[in-house]
Regions:
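Structural and coupling elements of P-loop NTPases
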Residues: 1-349
């Protein structure tokens, strides 16, 4: 909570070439917190996404809420990401919710990069926070300093990686330092969840953001696309409703390609139904643009896909999703009087 996720997201979008300037939460002009409630309260309520580049490589980020009240948005976003940047404040340190998010990421086999934020504040303790990440989360942290470069991670860091990987150690002893081999093996260790890079910085003034961009480019670049003839398959990670009542289904494409007007298999009670994609778009904050097609790894939004729910798999091997791991402590029930017709109640809801 209040670790600086949205501020860091704005800096990534700014330094990644998407924004002309980074917005501020306290000014209410951020790209990703565009909802009226978010801007008035100064907190992230809805998970929203945008594109940026790191060292010439394309990325898409999803800025998620930090408050436990909106953990559902965060958990659903985990289904869509190839890696996660876990932001920890150097002032508050590792919190209980940090541990919850960490467990969810581990359960879903999502690689993690730590950004230790607010290191510029007088009460910050970067070293203590790094030690707490190692002790409380059990993460094998690889500290990446301000001189880290995606093109050449450096021999000192390569030696740290070699100490964790027999293949890289053998190659290092035989041939010496090889920048490409060190970067590739480092990326493999990060993808496997065996190593978690960590960057210390201060998102508000941009400190450490360029280092983070280089870390993402070196260790977290998108996987290679599958063969073009693979059957289309995607996971639903979010559903939004337009003002006209239409449903927009947000998808992470897992294989194959999706184009507008194509029929897609969707899970329904008792079997599978086919729905036509009436529109395909890519979102960036509150704005969107039409897509001609969406390939493997793409985050897109489709209209017309029936009543699918977050977690469902559509396309080949269409099936309902697993229930969320996080359960709310409180629940609410709407009790209508006998004078209210069921259809009218449904319209009101």
């Amino acid at each position: 909570v209040d670790a600086g996720k949205t501020t860091l997201s704005e800096q990534l979008l700014y330094r990644g070439g998407t924004l002309r300037r980074a917005g501020r939460v306290d000014s209410g002009d951020t790209c990703l917190d565009h909802d009226v409630i978010e801007r008035s309260r100064g907190i992230t309520v809805f998970a929203d996404e945008a594109a940026f580049t790191a060292c010439g490589l394309p990325f898409r980020l999803i800025d998620t809420p930090g408050h436990a009240d909106f953990s559902g948005e965060m958990e659903r976003s985990i289904w869509a990401v190839d890696c996660a940047v876990l932001v920890v404040s150097c002032v508050e340190g590792v919190q209980a919710h940090t541990e919850t998010v960490w467990r969810l990421l581990r359960q879903n086999d999502v690689p993690v990069v730590f950004f230790l934020n607010k290191a510029d504040l007088p009460t910050a303790d970067a070293a203590g926070t790094l030690a707490a990440v190692r002790a409380r989360l059990g993460a094998d942290v690889l500290a990446c300093g301000p001189d880290f470069c995606a093109a050449d991670i450096g021999e000192a860091l390569a030696e740290e990686l070699a100490a964790r990987d027999e293949t890289l150690m053998e190659d290092y002893l035989v041939r010496g330092y090889d920048a490409q081999a060190a970067r590739e093996r480092g990326a493999a260790l990060v993808r496997a969840g065996l190593v978690c890079p960590a960057v210390v910085g201060a998102a508000l003034n941009g400190t450490g953001v360029d280092t983070l961009l280089n870390v993402l480019a070196a260790f977290c670049a998108a996987p290679q696309e599958e063969a073009g003839d693979a059957l289309f398959r995607a996971r639903v990670y979010k559903v939004r409703h337009e003002k006209n009542g239409g449903r927009i289904v947000f998808l992470k494409v897992l294989a194959g390609r999706l184009r507008p007007k194509e029929n897609v298999a969707c899970p329904e009670k008792g079997g599978t139904a086919y729905y036509k994609v009436n529109g395909l778009r890519a979102y960036s904050g509150g704005k969107s643009a039409p897509l001609a097609e969406a390939g493997p790894g793409t985050l897109c939004a489709a209209a017309g896909l029936g009543r699918v729910m977050p977690g469902d798999v559509v396309g080949a091997d269409a099936r309902p999703g697993m229930p969320p791991a996080l359960r709310p402590l409180l629940s609410a029930q709407v009790l209508a009087g006998p004078a209210l017709p069921p259809r009218r109640l449904l319209e009101l809801l």
